[in-house]
Every structure is written in C-alpha cells, then in structure tokens.
Amino acid sequence: MELVRIQKFIAESGLCSRRAAELAIVAGEVYVNGQKAELGQKVEPGTDKVTVRGKAIRAQAQPKLALVMHKPRGVVCSNSDPHAEQTIFDLLPREWARLRLFCAGRLDKDSEGLVILTSDGDLANKLMHPSNLVVKRYYVSLEEPFPAGRLRQLLRGVVIEGEHLKVERANLVNPDTSRSSTELDVHMHHGKKREIRQLFTALGFQVRRLRRYQIGSLRLKGIPLRGVKQLSSKEIQSLFVVPVAHYREMTPSTHDEN
C-alpha cells in the first residue's frame, strides 16, 4: 500500500483536521508502532499502528463530503464535550450522524450562523489555514451604539495576551443621524476563538448577538435554523471566492436573513 504522511492519514481517518493532527504530532501525542511520531513522517495504512492520545487510528473508507449547518445559539462546536448539553453533531440527521465529521472553523456557544462540517481533512485544512483567503462575514449586534468614528479601531485591532485581534472590514448597518449604530457588518479572514467578542469588549462594547452569515460567497439565506445541507462541488468552491462587496463600501439594510 502507498505510504502517506502521518498528518494526512490522521485527517483522513476523520479524527480531526490536518492542522489539528500536525499540532498533536508536535505536542508529542502521536505514536507510530510505539515510537513518538515526527511531523511529515510517512506511514503505511493497514500495517503501521498509529495512536493519538493513546487511541488507535485506522484508515476508514468513508465518503468525503462537506455539510453546512445553521448553528443556533447554545450549541457547542465540539465532537465531545462532557460539559455541553448539546453539540452541533447532535443536530445531524441520522444519515450523516454515523460519519466522523469535524468543524472547519468553529463558532462559540453563544454565536450562531454558518458552520462547515466535513470528513475531508484536506478541505478542512484549506479552509482554516491562514495562508488561504477565506472571507467570513458577521452580523454583530451591540448593547450600545457604535460610532462611525471608531471603526478604524476595529481595523487596527488590539493586542490581548500577546495576540493581535482585528477585523479586515467593518461597516455600520442602518446608522442614525449621529452616524452610530448598534448593528455592524464585519469581515474577517481568520477567526480565533471569541475574537470578535473580545475585540469589542476591549473597546468598551458588549456584544448582544453574533451571526456568521456568509463564508466566501456562500450565504446563510435559505438554510433554516438548525438546518443542514450537503454542499455541492460548486458550493465548496464558493467558500474560497472573495465577495465583490469585500472590496467596496457597503450600506446593507439588514443581515437578519433567517
């Protein structure tokens, strides 16, 4: 059988994304035939014994597919969380619940909107790797009005615990006569855990609601709350399309599409 890189083998087993597999290898959590694995090491599926955190990994013949879900608030993006009342995988229809899927770009428990689930480790890696431009758009609702004069602060960002948190674009939605609004349209290419919430909090604003309504050119519209659909090849490609609106000023009337 053809030798494959160990991070690819782990990702294709459905355990996690390739990036997560690489991190596990670097952390010393992956072993091949009882020996600590090295990044880039090749293994022979079906012959070499690979374990991750003590769990044996086997190559699985499962279809490569990608799903998109309209995640509701209160649901955790995790394959297993002993403290969570409900995870995003609990919402899957039976036909997909049996597959080993993982999130390619999570949303925190209090946020809602588009989440990509996939069994394709290569796709997940492509979606999450910082070298790829994947534009994510968010509707942000605040407890208090945000003035237009402070939008540049969102673009410059802030440094919290050594990490630079920022957005690529930010526009007010339905600004009032004083050029302020409690609603914003925000674009990001990356997205660390709770980054948008932390950024607004650092600037003195409390996020009331956060919804990811677009990834690339794939929009939330038409997908009901808790709804799941399989993405076609064309729709998968659309995740990597940079929307025209990303390059120009926008004055959207609403992003409450569902």
Report each predicted region and the residues it spans.
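Basic, flexible Lys/Arg- and Gly-enriched helix-loop patches that mediate nucleic-acid binding at interfaces
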Residues: 1-258
